[in-house]
Amino acid sequence: MPHLAELVAKAKAAVEGAQDIAALDLVRVEYLGKKGHLTLQMTSLRELPAEERPAAGAVINQAKQEVQEALNARKEKLESAVLNARLAAETIDVSLPGRRMENGGLHPVTRTIERIETFFGELGFSVESGPEIEDDYHNFDALNIPAHHPARADHDTFWFDATRLLRTQTSGVQIRTMQEQQPPIRIIVPGRVYRNDYDQTHTPMFHQMEGLIVDRDISFTNLKGTLHDFLRNFFEEDLQIRFRPSYFPFTEPSAEVDVMGKNGKWLEVLGCGMVHPNVLRNVGIDPEIYSGFAFGMGMERLTMLRYGVTDLRAFFENDLRFLKQFK
């Protein structure tokens, strides 16, 4: 088999010349396939004398093994080249800025509500809630607001029909609570309320917090002490605070509470007063035995004062540039 060495040399050259796996497989078929050159060498053994066949077969098998080893080595090299090319294409440029992880944060109004709930919770107040679609009895009548009161006008209130409306205050929850519970009562009522108004300091929907205590021997002194402590805790300052006489149908006497701003001007922060005897009677509580005080405040207004926000509407515009300041 003088040309066997030449076949092996040609096969190895073809193997090295293969530039991809498909071309390499063609070389394998050409030399080691069923009709390959080296396979045909094995079939030609029958032409040799019997005593020469073993030695010739060993030589052919050695040649086939050399070609197979060359094929394996070339295949491994080509596969490695393909993998390296893919890895190079997929290489991560560590110098590029990564994706920012955006952490959520509480809305500033939510922060205010939670801060107030925490303060009053430590004083033994429980948190109550009620329907936002209210009837005129709980929103007006039971709160000593007569039919001719301006608050019932269409331009101030969103009415569904003659008796149902979007609540204009959370005070209706006070009525429901007093109807269901006997004194002593100590609650706060956070929630959304609705009024037909929209400008820099008013929105059609805003958040309000009501507070109510009903018990024996509750006085205006208790009211003042509670609100003094609350405001100084909320603003984290020893503020100058004043109570101005005011009027609310559901409290008597009534007052509005102001704090001294950094500009030397008084800023109104909330309204309050002693629960009107008529309100207590409307819910079946004897005003000769029990008394109470109530207060109400706008969450957006307190948030504006605490954080120095000048436009109420910013709380509702979902501008992340604004909201991220409160994380």
Swiss-Prot record:
Catalytic activity field: tRNA(Phe) + L-phenylalanine + ATP = L-phenylalanyl-tRNA(Phe) + AMP + diphosphate + H(+)
Superkingdom classification of source: Bacteria
One of the protein's GO biological processes: phenylalanyl-tRNA aminoacylation
Residues that, per the record, bind Mg(2+): 252
Main localization of the protein described in the UniProt heading: cytoplasm
EC number: 6.1.1.20
InterPro entries: aa-tRNA-synth_II, aa-tRNA-synth_II/BPL/LPL, Phe-tRNA-synth_IIc_asu, Phe-tRNA_ligase_II_N, Phe_tRNA_ligase_alpha1_bac, Phenylalanyl-tRNA_Synthase, tRNA-bd_arm
GO cellular component: cytoplasm
Family: Belongs to the class-II aminoacyl-tRNA synthetase family. Phe-tRNA synthetase alpha subunit type 1 subfamily.
Cofactor(s) for this UniProt protein: Mg(2+)
Assembly with partners or alone: Tetramer of two alpha and two beta subunits.
Protein name as it appears in the record: Phenylalanine--tRNA ligase alpha subunit
Matching Pfam families: Phe_tRNA-synt_N, tRNA-synt_2d
Note on cofactor: Binds 2 magnesium ions per tetramer.
Enzyme class, spelled out: ligase
Keyword entries, A-Z: Aminoacyl-tRNA synthetase, ATP-binding, Cytoplasm, Ligase, Magnesium, Metal-binding, Nucleotide-binding, Protein biosynthesis
Gene3D superfamilies, per the entry: Bira Bifunctional Protein, Domain 2
GO MF, any single term: tRNA binding
Location(s), subcellular: Cytoplasm
